[in-house]
Amino acid sequence: MHDQQYLNDYFRNHWKPSLDAYTYSAYDVIAKKIESHEWLLDVGCGYNPFKSLVSHVVGVDPAMDQADFQVTIEDFYATKLFDVATCLGSLNFGDDAVVGRQINKMVSHLKTKSRVYWRLNPGRRDHASEKCQGIPFYPWSHRRLQDFAELHDFRQVNEQTETNGRVVRLYAEWHRS
């Protein structure tokens, strides 16, 4: 089941970010990997923190008013192709079909030579709010992400397991040239 209304309510009213405590996927760490001429598509941008860190960024998020486009990635249409995408906890919900569609759509907005930076919840209902028990977390593993990478002609690198002191997440990068 993929209930976008439930997810939107959860992220608007119950979720609290703690992203900069991560080693590999903190905003400032990733921002340093993005060159000043590159365009970033931030999928599930939340409060859109890359706006103050990256020269050219478009944030997409269905739940948050701070997004440049307040829509799901499936409903987002761009007039340009992007050099880089970030999916920092945003494509974590639903089954193989839902996640596959979301990745297909995100990749369709990228240039042939591009990168994607990922932070993934490996299916754990470990958010601070009890409301997260109703969320259909996707059971991510580095192997599952690798399968999607290969499907889209990306090379997956820098696989890591990281924590922010409270939860464990997976990190990886995709590179395509």
Where do the PLM segments sit?
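A conserved beta-strand element that flanks and buttresses the S-adenosyl-L-methionine
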Residues: 86
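A short glycine-rich, Lys/Arg-flanked "PGG" loop and its adjoining helix->strand segment in the class I
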Residues: 100-112
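Internal amphipathic alpha-helical segments of the cytochrome P450 catalytic fold
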Residues: 68, 99-100
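Short catalytic micro-motifs in class I SAM-dependent methyltransferases
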Residues: 89-93
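Class I (Rossmann-like) S-adenosyl-L-methionine-dependent methyltransferase catalytic domain
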Residues: 1-77, 115-177
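Short N-terminal helix/helix-N-cap motif within the alpha/beta-hydrolase-1
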Residues: 95-97
